[in-house]
Every structure is written in structure tokens, then in C-alpha cells.
From Swiss-Prot:
<feature type="zinc finger region" description="RING-type 2">
    <location>
        <begin position="867"/>
        <end position="902"/>
    </location>
</feature>
<feature type="coiled-coil region">
    <location>
        <begin position="936"/>
        <end position="963"/>
    </location>
</feature>
<dbReference type="InterPro" id="IPR000433">
    <property type="entry name" value="Znf_ZZ"/>
</dbReference>
<feature type="binding site">
    <location>
        <position position="118"/>
    </location>
    <ligand>
        <name>Zn(2+) 2</name>
    </ligand>
</feature>
<feature type="repeat" description="ANK 3">
    <location>
        <begin position="496"/>
        <end position="525"/>
    </location>
</feature>
<dbReference type="Pfam" id="PF06701">
    <property type="entry name" value="MIB_HERC2"/>
</dbReference>
<dbReference type="Pfam" id="PF00569">
    <property type="entry name" value="ZZ"/>
</dbReference>
<keyword id="KW-0833">Ubl conjugation pathway</keyword>
<keyword id="KW-0914">Notch signaling pathway</keyword>
<dbReference type="InterPro" id="IPR001841">
    <property type="entry name" value="Znf_RING"/>
</dbReference>
<dbReference type="Pfam" id="PF12796">
    <property type="entry name" value="Ank_2"/>
</dbReference>
<feature type="zinc finger region" description="RING-type 3">
    <location>
        <begin position="964"/>
        <end position="997"/>
    </location>
</feature>
<feature type="binding site">
    <location>
        <position position="85"/>
    </location>
    <ligand>
        <name>Zn(2+) 1</name>
    </ligand>
</feature>
<dbReference type="InterPro" id="IPR013083">
    <property type="entry name" value="Znf_RING/FYVE/PHD"/>
</dbReference>
<keyword id="KW-0479">Metal-binding</keyword>
<dbReference type="GO" id="GO:0005737">
    <property type="term" value="C:cytoplasm"/>
</dbReference>
<dbReference type="Pfam" id="PF13920">
    <property type="entry name" value="zf-C3HC4_3"/>
</dbReference>
Length: 1011
């Protein structure tokens, strides 16, 4: 049977499109995570030949260890007769069949499944080949997607290993562009690529058909996303990879003693104090990871990863047993049995259909233990639980197993086997075990005694760990020093690739880091997830260990297997203190992870304003704020897209982000905010004077987008809007304050595309600009009354009646900024510290705990009095860095020191800016030289100067990176083994690196592109 199955896999697998699998260990042969290749042939039942889209061809394992996953088997021609994809109507389904486990007779093909068709919460069965065992998968909503890359539409290609089409491409080495993925034949979908060559020729070429690869990509393209862990492993018989016979959905217990569990957990997720709940509670298997470890979910909602040897399948009644009981007329339960209610709400809702149904009042009973009161004729159970009684499907409960002699014997036998398994790999008896345990417990005398014995291995392992690693994680410095005297290997790795320094970082042992550093340990060592000790310390939140590692010159910007640097991890963990320390140590903000996000992008995506504030305050080069992802998105695009208002405000005001940068679709941040109807972001960008008439790739302006999203139902809602009008739409006229100052702060207008459109028109958006279809914004407006309103708003703006720069508008703006944000009756007269904002009057300020403008904690409140110099006007200028406001505008311009504290004035902030309005910050150096900036300075000149300044900073940055740090005259063209470099002339004269002072072991010359 096994031989015939292997032959079948070999025949049916040729041509499949594959990606790297769970046991991959071949670096970037494939081009990286997500890159795709084609199964060319099978050398044997254990080996398969794959040609990657980048042209690399090699043998990979498909038995015992599994290097590959099948992303799409449609090119092989495998078809499921009698089936049809219920989305795209493909009939029959060719390739992998995905069958919904929660709907009747609902199937998807691979393209639709990975394209998120049907309900993402529903679980699916994966059926790889007709008649094969179906595998139940986690819902897609809970699963990770990665991007496929390779020969897809947009890729640049040359001829590949199976090319046989003479000079259709114009000759060897000539390039072309893939325009579409097509079918080579009706029975082999997605097995060919249509290419337009640079010489003008175009044709269809094989990419998977019968295992052939006519093309090789020199510049890959994205091919959509796929659920990596849902793809079958090439060559594996059981898609669940279920060690110990455990399947997803099984209920499991832990029947072992705590010490044994902790020993078995080494290298399998470890043990923490929070896991004590698992010793007395039944959990459900919810996943099996790539290392064959079991992920178990508990009634508390926590998920823990276990060594499969720790778990025992619970003695429970499953739905199949219940069904058999029903047919036989007897129930597997008895009155008085103690049962535990299923805690998976989605599952129990499904099971309760036709069995008493589900009620929201049953929610508190999930995961609780109750007693069976009655068994109905259809075997449904009446259970007393949480002081009430409910009817349950017998499949929705599990009987709490009693402790009997048979179970005790089985447990004793199992314990014996586990103990044997735990230590069966130790070659030198029990000495290694004793050494590791003594090191973990800090028993110096016993460790010293064991090390004197000739037959002990100082690097021996117990449960996958050495004595060095155990002592490091537990902070036993004396034992570490003792082990170092006996020439212990400080770089020994455990199953996960973690070294002693990783364990020290995990255990928050800064002193151990010092000892290991003196012992020659590599502080930049990486484990199998490519994590350094710094990654681990940041993820665990160990600030002192982070500082210690950085003090020892640990590299602050190395990337893990996901491409994340410690900066990314600090942002994810919301540790601003660690983030600041990393930035002070020179962490590189510009490094991007595998998804293309640098630290600024990551903070914007996460909506983390405190992290963004730290990043912007310590940004080494201001122009980094406008760095783009590969799709053209800047941090401001991401904040606008996800409606992270505070982050966007920081980027605009503190980061001075360019508001008009366009992504690959030529959309600005304003396009995205209008498209998603994020009114606060729209108001922010327009107030900051973003350009309103930039066109995207379709020629649409933000006003086109606003009117496209406008519907007649939204027009009807506008009739009741407080700030737009209180009569019917024929007399609807938006108030000028609403249109210019914002979109209102409450009511339905916040989500109204129509009010956004009026706001844009009132601020000068062009009503006549046409998109590529020849449509103006008014052509997209279905309501003539709204068209008239838009035209009127635009006309008033053009004539200056509603202009943002008109005197009336400035007065309105000033009045709005001066009124208290709480009561709106009195004027603002209280300065908040330490942020320096003015938001309320003195009567309302005691009630405000956080600043209404920046959300920072208010630590001080100072009422603004009259100018201490002239006593004629109120104080209206905030001095920085002292934070005092004690002088009016005229007097403040003459001061070099604060009259209140005598601190040097570095910057002056006008009253209007403290109220979050617009103004000009005075710089002390300019004032000292007599150059006081004018409030009405031309905006275009300011933008030009800012752009020139950014370019100068970029040029200076490039010079610093490329010039010799010694002579500062010649280009850097010699690199040392430490990673630093100089010019050749300086380098030849040195015996130690001028940067880190390490001895120069070897010199490597660099060559420019012109050499």
C-alpha cells in the first residue's frame, strides 16, 4: 500500500506549484519565504526535483522530513469529478478541493479559497486528491497569509531550463514581461504564462505544465497571498502531522507530575507560571505547529504550546459516539455524571441547532462543569450548571473522567515510558542529567564535584539543554564561572538554536550577560528564528538586559526570520522606554521587514502614537518620515488608511511629513482618507494645506472619490444634519464654519461622503478637472441640488467670500481656537504641562486629566497672566525648553533668556500654535541675527526651502556613509572583518580599526560599478 501510494504521489505531483515547507533548511535557494517553484520530477519516493522561478534547480526531501508545501496543484491536472467551485463555477474543481465544514455542499477551488471567498470564520476540509483523507483546518480568519512571489503578472523573465522555442524572445538573455497567467490546456489550469518580449513578440510559455519551466524570472512579481499553513506538505500522508495520534479538536489532559512536564517542555515552548491552569483543566487541540508541537486552548482563552509527550487524550464522548448512542436507544451518559461544557462559542452554537438551540444567557456556562439532571429520549442532556439548567447536545459536553485503578496503572506505565524517553539519548549515563540539574538549581558544590570526574561531558545535554544554558537562564553566576574554567562551549545550541546568551536574555539576567561577554560569547548570535539576544530581551520587556547588551556594542538592528528588528518588536510590545534606548544606540529606523514596513511604517500601521512620538523626536534624518514601502505607501498613507488620527497629527505637525506623496496607484493620503470616509483625517490634511486636486492612476481627485461614495440614502440623512441644514435638500446650504473649520464633531455628518465633498469644494477643490474616463466630479454627483451646493461653495471660495485666507475666516478661526474646548463659553487661559498646550479655561482645567489635544497626562496647570514686562497685553509666547509663558509677542521677540527662570530661550511658540492652530515657530538663532520670520511668509517658498534642506541632508548622509572616516577626503573602499572601513591609503597604515579598536585581521577592497 505504501509503495503504491508513493508512486501515485510521484505521478500526480509533477507540475505542482510549491513553496518552502515546514522542514526547510536551505536558506534562500528558493529566493525567500513565499517564493514559488515547479515540481519537475521525482528522483525517488524520498526526493523531488524542483525548479524555482528564479532558475535554481535542486533536490528536496519529501519523506521523513518535508521541505515543500503544495501551493497549487491545478497544473498537475488532478480533478475532482462531480464537484464545482461555488464562487467561480469551475467544474470540475482541478487541483486541491476545499470543502466548507459548516455549510452543506459548499466547495471552493484553490484560487477562491486563498482569495478569501466565503466566510472567513468557517472551517474547511482540505481534500488534496479524489478519495484522499480530508483534513480539517483552522478558520482562515485565525491563520497567517503570506505573499506569493515569482513568475506572475508583472514579472520580468528570460528563457528558462526547458526553453525550446528558438529565438522567439529575440535571443538568449533577452527579457520580457509576464502579462497574465493562463492555462496551457483546459485540463491543466494556471500552467502557463503569457509574455510580451522587449522585441515586441508575444506568446504563451509553460510554467508547470508537465513539470516544464520555459521561463526564469530576473525580477519577480507578487502573485496574491496564500494561507501557508493550510497548504498540504508534499509527500506527507497525513496533513495534520499528528504526533501521538492527536488531531485538531481533540480534548487533552496533562496527567504527569509538574517536574516531568517542565523537563519535557524544554525546547517545546518552555514553561511559565501562567501554565499551572493546564495541570487541572481539559483543553482542546487547536493547532499543530511546524515543529510537531501541539497548541492547546483552555477555557480561560489562553493558548499554550506543548511537547506532544506531555498530553493525554481525554476520556470524553465525541459526536460520533453520541450518534451511535442515539441509534441504539441508550445514552453514554448517566444521571449524576459531572460534565464540562464546551468553551468554543462558535462550535457550541453549531452543535446546539436542533438540540435546545443557543441562547445568549448560556454564555456564562462555557467551559464550566455541571451535573447531568435528566437524559431525554433523543439523548439530549439537561445539565445543571452555574445555578441554572439548560439543554445541551451530548456532543457539546465532555464527561469528567473518574480516577480508577485502570487509569492509575496506565498513567504509571506512561510515566515510566516518558522518563525513559526523556533520558534515553544520553550517552554517558546519568552524569549529564545531574550536571544540568545541579547547574539549574545553583548547586555549586555538586557541579564542582561532577566536573572533577573524568567521564562527565561539560557540554552534555539533558532534555535538550546544557548546564551552561540552564545556569544562564537562572542567573547562577558562580556556576558559569566554574564551567568557563573547564572550557565549556559558550556557543552550544539547543533544539531551537538558542545559546547561553539567549537564555540569559530570556531570564532577565544582566550579570550573566557580562560574564558571557568576558567569556567570549557572541552577543549577536542568532537562533533558528534568526533572533538575537536583543530580540528576546525586547520581546520579554527586559529593559536592563537591553541596556546591558547595547553597552557591550550589540548590533541594534539585526533582523529575524520575519525581517523584524528590535525596533519593530519594541513598537509591537508598546515599550517606548526600550524604543528610546534602541534609538539612542543608533538603531536603524529605515530597515524594512519582510512585509516592507520600516519602524515608522510599523508604528503608523499599529496606531501607536507614543511610539511615533519617540521615533520622530529621535529621527536621525528628517526626510526618513517620507520613506515609501514597495507599494509607495508612506507612514502618513498608513495612518490615513487606518484612521489613526493621533499618529497622523504627529506625522503632519511634528514630523513635517510631505502631504502630497503618491503611492503606486498615485493616491495621496487624502485620497485614502476620503475613500474610507475618515473625516478627522480629511480635516487634518486639508487644514495642513494638502493639495486637493492631485489625480490618481485613474485620474480621480479626492473630490471624485467623495462623490463616488455618495448615495441617495446618504443625501436623505443630510436633511437632519445640524450643521448643514434643517430644511429639505432644495434649500440646503452648508454653514461656512462647518465647511472650512471641519466636518463637524458629532452627528451623521462624520460619515457622510456628501459633507466631505462640500468641505473639499469649500476649500478650493476643482470641480472641472476630469479623470481618464472624461468625468468631472459633478458628473459623478447624482443629485442636482448637491451639484448646486458644490458649485456655490466653490464659487464663494474663488471669490474670497469663504476663503481660508480672507479676514473673516481668520477671525472665525482665531475665535474658534481661543474658546474653551470644554464649556465653549470662556476663552482658553490655562497652560498644560509638560506638553505646552492650551485647551481650556481656568474653571474647566481642574477636570481635565489628559490634554485634549495630545492625550498626554497633565502634570501641571498654569493660568496665563499679563505680560511680566509691559503689563499691557496677555502673555502669548511659550518659551522652550523651559515651558514658561510670561511675555507678549512684542516683548518675547526681544528676549534671549526667560525672565521667569533665566533659562536660555531656544524656541518660541506662539499662542495660536499652543492651541493647535497654525503659526510660525521662532528659532532663537534667527532672532539673534535679526531675521524674524514673517507670519505671512509665502508657503511655496517655504516648501521649496524645506525640499532643498532635505536634499542637502540626504547628500550629507550619503557623504558620511561613503567617505573615509579618518581623512574625510577620499571615498571608503576598504572594509575590515569587524565591518568598519576606510580608504585604502589610511587602511594600509593601520593595525587596528579606528572605529571599534579591534585588531585588523584582514582587509577587503571594494570596487565601484565603474571598475
Amino acid at each position: 500500500m505504501s509503495g503504491s501510494r508513493n508512486n501515485r504521489v510521484m505521478v500526480e505531483g509533477v507540475g505542482a506549484r510549491v513553496a518552502r515547507g515546514p522542514d526547510w533548511k536551505w536558506g534562500k535557494q528558493d529566493g525567500g519565504e513565499g517564493h514559488v517553484g515547479t515540481v519537475r520530477s521525482f528522483e525517488s519516493p524520498e526526493e523531488v526535483v524542483v525548479v524555482w522561478d528564479n532558475g535554481t534547480a535542486a533536490n528536496y526531501r519529501c519523506s521523513g522530513a518535508y521541505d515543500l508545501r503544495i501551493m497549487d496543484s491545478a497544473p498537475t491536472g488532478i480533478k475532482h469529478d462531480g464537484t464545482m467551485c461555488d464562487t467561480c463555477r469551475q467544474q470540475p474543481i482541478i487541483g486541491i478541493r476545499w470543502k466548507c465544514a459548516e455549510c452543506t455542499n459548499y466547495d471552493l477551488c484553490t484560487v477562491c479559497y486563498h482569495g478569501d471567498k466565503h466566510h472567513l470564520r468557517h472551517r474547511f476540509y482540505r481534500i488534496t486528491t479524489p478519495g484522499s483523507e480530508r483534513v480539517l483546518l483552522e478558520s482562515r480568519r485565525k491563520s497567517k497569509k503570506i505573499t506569493a512571489r515569482g513568475i506572475f503578472a508583472g514579472a520580468r523573465v528570460v528563457r528558462g531550463v526547458d526553453w525550446q522555442w528558438e529565438d522567439q524572445d529575440g535571443g538568449n538573455g533577452r527579457r520580457g514581461k509576464v502579462t497574465e497567467i493562463q492555462d496551457w490546456s483546459a485540463s491543466s489550469p494556471h500552467s502557463a504564462a503569457y509574455v510580451l518580449w522587449d522585441n515586441g513578440a508575444k506568446n504563451l510559455y509553460r510554467v508547470g505544465f508537465e513539470g516544464m519551466s520555459d521561463l526564469k524570472c530576473v525580477q519577480d512579481a507578487k502573485g496574491g497571498s496564500f494561507y501557508r499553513d493550510h497548504c498540504p506538505v508534499l509527500g506527507e500522508q497525513n496533513g495534520n502531522r499528528n504526533p501521538g495520534g492527536l488531531l485538531i479538536g481533540d480534548l487533552v489532559n496533562i496527567d504527569l507530575e509538574l517536574e516531568i512536564v517542565q523537563s519535557l517542555q524544554h525546547g517545546h515552548g518552555g514553561w511559565t507560571d501562567g501554565m499551572f491552569e493546564t495541570l487541572t483543566t481539559t483543553g482542546t487541540v487547536c493547532g499543530i505547529d511546524e515543529d510537531h508541537d501541539i497548541v492547546v486552548q483552555y477555557p480561560s482563552g489562553n493558548r499554550w504550546t506543548f511537547n506532544p509527550a506531555v498530553l493525554t487524550k481525554a476520556n470524553v464522548v465525541r459526536s460520533g459516539d453520541a450518534a451511535q448512542g442515539a441509534e441504539g436507544g441508550t445514552s453514554p451518559f448517566q444521571v449524576g455524571d459531572l460534565v464540562q461544557i464546551c468553551y468554543d462559542i462558535e462550535r457550541i452554537k453549531l452543535l446546539q441547532r436542533g438540540h435546545g438551540e443557543w441562547a445568549e444567557a448560556m454564555l456564562p456556562t462555557l467551559g464550566k462543569v455541571g451535573r447531568v439532571q435528566q437524559i431525554y429520549s433523543d439523548n439530549d442532556l439537561k445539565v445543571e450548571v452555574c445555578g441554572t439548567s439548560w439543554t445541551y447536545n451530548p456532543a457539546a459536553v465532555s464527561r469528567v473522567a473518574s480516577v480508577g485503578s485502570a487509569i492509575s496503572n496506565a498513567t504509571g506505565e506512561r510515566l515510566s515510558q516518558l522518563l525513559k524517553k526523556l533520558f534515553e539519548t544520553q550517552e554517558s549515563g546519568d552524569l549529564n542529567e545531574e550536571l544540568v540539574k545541579a547547574a539549574a538549581n545553583g548547586d555549586v558544590a555538586k557541579v564542582d564535584d561532577l566536573l572533577k570526574r573524568q567521564d562527565v561531558d561539560v557540554n552534555g545535554q539533558c532534555a535538550g539543554h546544557t548546564a551552561m544554558q540552564a545556569a544562564s537562564q537562572n542567573g547562577h553566576v558562580d556556576i558559569l564561572k566554574l564551567l568557563l574554567k573547564h572550557s565549556v562551549d559558550v556557543e552550544a545550541e539547543d533544539k531551537d538554536g538558542d545559546r547561553a546568551v539567549h537564555h540569559a536574555a530570556f531570564g532577565d539576567e544582566g550579570t550573566v550577560i557580562e560574564v558571557l561577554q568576558r567569556g567570549g560569547a557572541d552577543l549577536n548570535a542568532r537562533n533558528k528564528r534568526r533572533q538575537t539576544p536583543l530580540h528576546i530581551a525586547v520581546n520579554k520587556g527586559h529593559l536592563q538586559v537591553v541596556k546591558k547588551l547595547l553597552d557591550f556594542s550589540c548590533h541594534p538592528s539585526l533582523q529575524d526570520s520575519e525581517g523584524d528588528t528590535p525596533l519593530h518588536d519594541a513598537i509591537s510590545k508598546k515599550r517606548d522606554d526600550i524604543l528610546a534606548v534602541l534609538l539612542e544606540a543608533g538603531a536603524d529606523v529605515t530597515i524594512t521587514n519582510n512585509n516592507g514596513f520600516n519602524a515608522l511604517h510599523h508604528a503608523a500601521l499599529r496606531g501607536n502614537p507614543s511610539a511615533m512620538r519617540v521615533l520622530l523626536s529621535k529621527l536621525p534624518r528628517p526626510w526618513i518620515v517620507d520613506e515609501k514601502k514597495d507599494d509607495g505607501y508612506t507612514a502618513l498613507h498608513l495612518a490615513a488608511l487606518n484612521n489613526h488620527v493621533e499618529v497622523a497629527e504627529l506625522l503632519v505637525h511634528q514630523g513635517s511629513a510631505n502631504l502630497d506623496i503618491q503611492n503606486v496607484n498615485q493616491q495621496t493620503a487624502l485620497h485614502l482618507a476620503v475613500e474610507r470616509q475618515h473625516t478627522q483625517i480629511v480635516r487634518l490634511l486639508v487644514r495642513a494645506e494638502a493639495k486637493l486636486d492631485i489625480q490618481d492612476k485613474d485620474g480621480d481627485t479626492p473630490l471624485h472619490e467623495a462623490l463616488r461614495h455618495h448615495t441617495l440614502s446618504q443625501l436623505r440623512q443630510l436633511q437632519d444634519m445640524q450643521d448643514v441644514g434643517k430644511v429639505d435638500t432644495t434649500t440646503w446650504e452648508p454653514s461656512k464654519n462647518t465647511l472650512i473649520m471641519g466636518l463637524g464633531t458629532q452627528g451623521a455628518e462624520k460619515k457622510s461622503a456628501a459633507s466631505i465633498a462640500c468641505f473639499l469644494a469649500a476649500n478650493g477643490a476643482d470641480l472641472a478637472v476630469r479623470n481618464k474616463k472624461g468625468q468631472s466630479p459633478l458628473d459623478l454627483c447624482p443629485d442636482p441640488n448637491l451639484c448646486k451646493t458644490l458649485a456655490k461653495c466653490h464659487k464663494e471660495k474663488s471669490s474670497g467670500q469663504v476663503g481660508s485666507h480672507s479676514p473673516s475666516m481668520i477671525n472665525n478661526d482665531s475665535e474658534t481656537l481661543e474658546e474653551c474646548m470644554v464649556c465653549s463659553d470662556l476663552k482658553r487661559d490655562t497652560l498644560f504641562g509638560p506638553c505646552g498646550h492650551i485647551a481650556t479655561c481656568s474653571l474647566c482645567s481642574p477636570r481635565v486629566k489628559k490634554c485634549l489635544l495630545c492625550k498626554e497626562q497633565v502634570q501641571s496647570r498654569t493660568k496665563i497672566e499679563e505680560c511680566v514686562v509691559c503689563s499691557d497685553k496677555k502673555a502669548a509666547v511659550l518659551f522652550q525648553p523651559c515651558g514658561h509663558m510670561c511675555a507678549c509677542e512684542n516683548c518675547a521677540s526681544l528676549m534671549k533668556k526667560c525672565v521667569q527662570c533665566r533659562a536660555v530661550v531656544e524656541r518660541r511658540v506662539p499662542f495660536v500654535m499652543c492651541c493647535s492652530g497654525k503659526g510660525t515657530e521662532d528659532v532663537a538663532d534667527d532672532i539673534a541675527g535679526g531675521n524674524i520670520p514673517a507670519l505671512q511668509k509665502d508657503k511655496d517658498n517655504t516648501n521649496v526651502n524645506a525640499d532643498v534642506q532635505k536634499l542637502q541632508q540626504q547628500l550629507q548622509d550619503i557623504k558620511e556613509q561613503t567617505m573615509c572616516p579618518v581623512c574625510l577626503d577620499r571615498l571608503k573602499n576598504m572594509i575590515f572583518m569587524c565591518g568598519h572601513g576606510t580608504c585604502q591609503l589610511c587602511g594600509d597604515r593601520m593595525s587596528e580599526c579606528p572605529i571599534c579598536r579591534k585588531a585588523i585581521e584582514r582587509r577587503i577592497l571594494l570596487y565601484s560599478m565603474s571598475c
